Amino acid sequence: MTAAEAPLPPLAPRERTATTAAERRTGSPLAVSLSGVRKSFGDKTVLSGIDLEITRGEFVVLLGPSGTGKTTLLRLLSGLEPPDGGDVLVPRQRTVVYQEPRLIPSKRVLANVSVGQKRAQLTRDNARRALAEVNLADKERAWPATLSGGEAQRVALARALVREPELLLLDEPFAALDALTRLQMQDLVGDLVARHRPAVLLVTHDVDEAVRLADRVLILDNGGFAVDVDIDLPRPRDRNDPEALRYRATFLAQLGVGRPSSTRQDIS
């Protein structure tokens, strides 16, 4: 098993004795809790005491300028990067889908989906169901080299789903896809998340993607969250809806697009 397919290391859960604000807001159990989390690399502070709660079934999108710590936060939640301080609560069942599908070239599609899983026959059955969910039931005998970029990324999604994660981490999974395939993948991910109900954290630079998919958008800047706002729009979402355009314009302004960074605005 390669490092890309190895199970994520467990983090010891922390006891909780009270219902959190996030649980009261969404009505779902808490999946992620960060309290006062800090992370630095040398003299550069990336995360300076952040707090974050995500509940089961909540789709959170993380935006931010390059170098602000988005991928560091995702790696911290996956267990691949230790915090320098603070408390971390994440579920043991969690998985990551990256920008590159990271399929094993020497294994067929079905074997890629079931890699690392035990109980071979049950795993194959589950892998076939996962492939059907991503509309690749006819590709189980295919080799990775024969797949398009979108198909390979769907295999990576199926591999994540077969593990039944309570937390799904998405690290710019659509960034390398063409515009049409990107929209199709966004719709597919939205449908799969609605069906399986994991907590989701999607890291992206695409504001339109955030407005299209998110229940909640965070913008990371200067070591903390400059924005933490719910997206209160019906689904499916029309990118030309006036409210969607308002969210888009506000997020772009906060990211410093189209105006000097000194005039970034807060939203409530």
Curated annotation (Swiss-Prot):
Listed GO MF terms: ATP binding; ATP hydrolysis activity
The protein's Enzyme Commission number: 7.6.2.14
Coiled coil start-end: none
EC class name: translocase
Alphabetically ordered keywords of this record: ATP-binding, Cell membrane, Membrane, Nucleotide-binding, Translocase, Transport
Pfam families tied to this protein: ABC_tran
Transmembrane segments: none
Reactions performed catalytically: ATP + H2O + aliphatic sulfonate-[sulfonate-binding protein]Side 1 = ADP + phosphate + aliphatic sulfonateSide 2 + [sulfonate-binding protein]Side 1
Positions contributing to ATP binding: G64, P65, S66, G67, T68, G69, K70, T71
Assembly and interaction partners: The complex is composed of two ATP-binding proteins (SsuB), two transmembrane proteins (SsuC) and a solute-binding protein (SsuA).
Protein task: Part of the ABC transporter complex SsuABC involved in aliphatic sulfonates import. Responsible for energy coupling to the transport system.
PANTHER family in the cross-refs: ALIPHATIC SULFONATES IMPORT ATP-BINDING PROTEIN SSUB, TAURINE IMPORT ATP-BINDING PROTEIN-RELATED
Protein name according to UniProt: Aliphatic sulfonates import ATP-binding protein SsuB 3
Gene encoding the protein: ssuB3
